[in-house]
Amino acid sequence: MNKKQIVLAVALAAALAVTGVLSGCGSKTAKNEGTVTLTNVSYDPTRELYQEYNSVFQKHYKEQTGKDIQIIQSHGGSGGQARSVIEGNKADVVTLALAHDITLVEKAGLIKKDWLQMFPKDSSPYTSTIVFLVRKGNPKQIKDWDDLIKPGVNVITPDPKSSGGACWNFLGAWAYGQKRFNNDEEKTKDFVASLYKNVSVMDSGARGATTTFVENGQGDVLIAWENEAINSVRQQPDAFEIVTPSISILAQPSVAVVSKNVKKNGTADAAKEYLSYLYSDEAQRIERTSRVIDKEAAGSMERRKREGYF
């Protein structure tokens, strides 16, 4: 499935739900004349990634320009974040879970129509996939998507109305249903509907869903971004483990410069460099819990084998 197909597929999935609207917060300007300020509006599970990346980029930017740069981060469900920009959040860049969400901002006249071509790999500097996070020992013996529709299995996943990760979760389940039922759409719909009947909590974003499962102890299985699941296991290796479904989906988060805002803010060059540097060797090593696009960096990354990408 190429990027354009994914955009259409996610748009179709999103159309099944009532669109949620979340308001956002505005930004800045730097009081210090020698300091550039950027606002990066991003999706939920990228907090740690951009905390580390921003530190590296600040050093790089200082070396290249002689100027200091301050980066303001905003995180939340990808759909809600896109709408916050449309409604007035003065983001310089967006780094969102779905190309579809950036397309919404583009259609609002804030991003150039050729944004997909502005950066390599269709403006997708890293990828991920969807896995299951279960409690240690896997007490419900969850091994594949089929197990999520069994009676008594309590599933946690975010809300597709506001979360990009939730849309990828939906598409992963749909892909499994299509293969299992030989592309029978009605049977696939019934399968996915049965899965969502077992969902007890739908938070607005992926990080909220992780908190519900990991910290609040709710649910038997969390459908999660791979990098989010890896972080949970790293932090509590005796409490959780990852289950790899037989079929998943290659999730491609996207990035773009908010051209209308950077023109007003005078930050166009800094914003472009901020996103371009995500493709550097140094940044690709930081993105180690995502599926980086640099082959050398990927060699040292904690990667898990997958089947059934499309």
Feature annotation, model-predicted:
Residues 54-63, 86-90, 99, 106-110, ...:
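Sec-exported extracytoplasmic/periplasmic mature domains
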Residues 181-246:
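Ligand-binding pocket segment of bilobal, Venus flytrap-like solute-binding proteins
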Residues 124-129, 192-196, 203, 235-263, ...:
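Periplasmic-binding protein-like
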Residues 31-162, 302-305:
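N-terminal segment of the mature folded domain
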Residues 1-37:
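Short, low-complexity disordered leader/linker segments with a strong preference
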Residues 262-310:
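Extracellular/periplasmic juxtamembrane helices and adjacent flexible linkers that interface
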Residues 41-43, 134-136, 154-181, 196-199, ...:
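Short beta-strand->loop
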Residues 137-143, 162, 175-183, 261-269:
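Short helix-loop capping/hinge motifs at secondary-structure junctions, enriched
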